[in-house]
Amino acid sequence: MVSIRLPDGSVRQYEHPVTVAEVAASIGPGLAKAALGGKLDGELVDTSTVIDRDASLAIVTDKDADGLDIIRHSTAHLLAYAVKELYPEAQVTIGPVIDNGFYYDFAYNRPFTPEDLEKIEKRMQELAKKDEPVTRRVVSRDEAAGYFRSIGEKYKAEIIESIPQSDEIKLYSHGGFTDLCRGPHVPSTGKLKVFKLMKVAGAYWRGDSKNEQLQRIYGTAWTKKEDQDQYLHMLEEAEKRDHRKLGKQLDLFHMQEESPGMVFWHPKGWALWQQVEQYMRRRVNDAGYLEIKTPMIMDRSLWEASGHWQNYRENMFTTESEKRDYAIKPMNCPGHVQVFKHGLRSYRDLPLRYAEFGSCHRNEASGALHGLMRVRGFVQDDAHIFCTEDQFIAESIAFNTLAMSVYKDFGFEHIDIKLSLRPEQRAGTDETWDRAEQGLRDALTACGLTWQELPGEGAFYGPKIEYHIKDALGRSWQCGTLQLDMVLPERLGAEYVAEDNSRRRPVMLHRAIVGSMERFLGILIEHHAGAMPVWLAPFQAIVLNIAESQAEYAQSLAQTLQKQGVRVAADLRNEKISYKIREHTLEKVPYLLVVGDKERDAQTVAVRARGGVDLGVMPVEAFVERLQEDLRSFK
């Protein structure tokens, strides 16, 4: 007798072992038809999996996130099947699920073209319509390796030969195609109805640039066509908002090969940067932080003491001078500890909050670099709080409040919060971790925030809160962190004199709100599609004269506004006014101030707001008041 407990708590009993598919059928024909897999005691399995013991089971359908993963994984195999049918000489390698889709890497003697992708996708649709059953068999490692060697699939054979000999190997087959995979997969190809191939890119075998270059075909797959259409629309919108494209269009920044992963900021881009930095400086100053500046290059001995030299050296830029080894800092924390240590600290000095817009460098792989989003040289809005155990909850509450307020000011309303908990390998006692984790929970609760817990995802030196902001396209970006550190103060000898005159280690909180300034500016540009809020815009207004006779008034008006703190310029070029309006509209300037003879004579201005909204003619003072109203909450 086999007892199966279902998600609703009910128990079904069977006189003999049953498959997941048979359990689904016993519940109802609709569920049997919809079943894509099962979750057996928490493990994702195929519908053909036999259950021969008492267990809990959830039937997985396309309404579940796991069901969508199964569909995408199976579609990757369908892609490989189609490629092998159309291009038999192509060799298959790996094909995993990724965010919003999948990819498969192939070795082939020529590049795949867009026309090839159309043929492959058409063949995939034909194979899916055949509704061929997907079967699984378990074989020994040697048998699997021998099979793939015999059909000329050397990459698959190499993967298998790297697996321990005692491990069982799962092979999945549909039609004339067999692939190596852990599974699970859909019961038949007919379940794969909504998919699209997206692009081809280069990739290296096993991710090693010393190995052969492969071709990676990316695709997306969904349960409903509406979901796919929505995703494709989002991609189109994301392409329009691409910060690299807008950076060029709006003349904000550029990057070039002579300095990979470093940014050349243009005047308008640097004006935007300054608005963000000055705003953040005001906020941390108001929150009781002390701004400091630490060296960019420090001796190897400090990095050895902190542990970075041993654990992070391959990501650090190093140099040598007068027979001493140095590293350009990849992070600011060791330098902040040095400032804390400079002089004897008392419990009366705590909490101490040190902030720095610290310039850091990390030797990221060239292939991973991506505009402002992944760079080698970056500035962090970094801060470290040194406090007592009794103070860290209050400090965490204050930081949560500050971070949420900052994100709202920048236009981000939806923040997902994740709490990473203790890993298996960790420093400190269970009691210390209990206090640390519960303290962060209490701080989040006190702020009325909800969060997702990630067991085992914390750093070895302490638990961490992550703040993921959602942009206008629904994409999630991790920006902020609050990391409790139980190790670095001890490694670097930070201590304070407690009330009983004993020496104690401070609790150290690493914290950032925007994280990398470069990356955050990239996110901001895409979130606002380049149309920055008035308080952030590089130029808040441009004064445009219609003819030469108004040039002096236009220039005087710009100077008057400038003295009142408005970021403004005058465009006095001898061009048609329609041309100038169009040009500055494309530059997404919030306000265009047009002056003709009437405006000059009346000392007024014709105001056009972004989006072509005509606000009419008004006195200069009225425009300034309107602008100040826009800015009031950020002063």
UniProtKB/Swiss-Prot annotation:
Annotated CDD domains: TGS_ThrRS (cd01667), ThrRS_anticodon (cd00860), ThrRS_core (cd00771)
Metal-binding found in the keyword field: yes
GO annotation (BP), single: threonyl-tRNA aminoacylation
Cited Pfam families: HGTP_anticodon (PF03129), TGS (PF02824), tRNA-synt_2b (PF00587), tRNA_SAD (PF07973)
Cofactors named for this entry: Zn(2+)
Enzyme class: ligase
Chief location: cytoplasm
Intracellular or extracellular location(s): Cytoplasm
GO terms for cellular component: cytosol
InterPro entries on file: aa-tRNA-synt_IIb, aa-tRNA-synth_II, aa-tRNA-synth_II/BPL/LPL, Anticodon-bd, Anticodon-bd_dom_sf, Beta-grasp_dom_sf, TGS, TGS-like
Signal peptide: none
Binding-site residues for Zn(2+), renumbered to this chain: C333, H384, H510
SUPFAM superfamilies: Class II aaRS ABD-related (SSF52954), Class II aaRS and biotin synthetases (SSF55681), TGS-like (SSF81271), ThrRS/AlaRS common domain (SSF55186)
Keyword NADP applies: no
Protein family according to the UniProt entry: Belongs to the class-II aminoacyl-tRNA synthetase family.
Subunit description: Homodimer.
Record's protein name: Threonine--tRNA ligase
